[in-house]
């Protein structure tokens, strides 16, 4: 059996259905003596570019070990599920069980409750960029006139 990494993006209106979808896809893999090495729900995230006029979507990552028939059935399910906007299947050399960088990033930062919080922290970050030790004066300010 081969190892695969699968990422699929779910329509944001179907976020409540993600757990049922992952359960269904997990059953496809394990039903044919496959294994799931890692299953991560990254949650609703901003898309890099709009897909079907949507700017946010729900991301899910799976690292699995399965045969070709199971993989074909998974891909068939992805293609004919209207809730899945995009999917990507990559063949891996071996199983990956460590948390992905997306999950590590989420643990190191406190979660933001809304978009307003990120707007409020942006000016604070800009203010802290100018440290007291830096010389940020213009030439008019730095050259005293007699």
From Swiss-Prot:
Pfam families: Ribosomal_S6. The keyword Ribosomal protein applies. Gene3D superfamilies: 3.30.70.60. GO terms for cellular component: cytosolic small ribosomal subunit. Residues 94-146 are annotated as: Disordered. Coiled coil: none annotated. InterPro entries: Ribosomal_bS6, Ribosomal_bS6_sf, Ribosomal_S6_plastid/chlpt, Transl_elong_EF1B/ribsomal_bS6. Keywords: Ribonucleoprotein, Ribosomal protein, RNA-binding, rRNA-binding. GO terms for molecular function: small ribosomal subunit rRNA binding; structural constituent of ribosome. Residues 106-115, 134-146 have a biased composition (Basic and acidic residues). GO terms for biological process: translation. Binds together with bS18 to 16S ribosomal RNA. Belongs to the bacterial ribosomal protein bS6 family. This is Small ribosomal subunit protein bS6. The lineage of its organism: Bacteria, Pseudomonadati, Pseudomonadota, Betaproteobacteria, Nitrosomonadales. The gene is rpsF.
């Amino acid at each position: 059996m081969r190892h695969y990494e699968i990422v699929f993006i779910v329509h944001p209106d179907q976020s409540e259905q993600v757990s049922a979808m992952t359960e269904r896809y997990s059953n496809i893999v394990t039903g044919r003596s496959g294994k799931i090495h890692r299953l991560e729900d990254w949650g609703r995230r901003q898309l890099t570019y709009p897909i079907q006029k949507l700017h946010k979507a729900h991301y899910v990552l799976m690292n699995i070990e399965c045969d070709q028939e199971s993989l074909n059935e998974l891909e068939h399910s992805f293609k004919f599920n209207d809730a899945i906007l995009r999917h990507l299947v990559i063949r891996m050399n071996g199983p990956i069980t460590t948390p992905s960088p997306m999950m590590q990033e989420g643990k190191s930062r406190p979660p933001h409750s809304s978009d307003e919080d990120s707007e409020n922290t942006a000016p604070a970050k800009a203010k802290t960029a100018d440290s007291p030790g830096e010389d940020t004066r213009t030439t008019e300010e730095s050259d005293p006139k007699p």
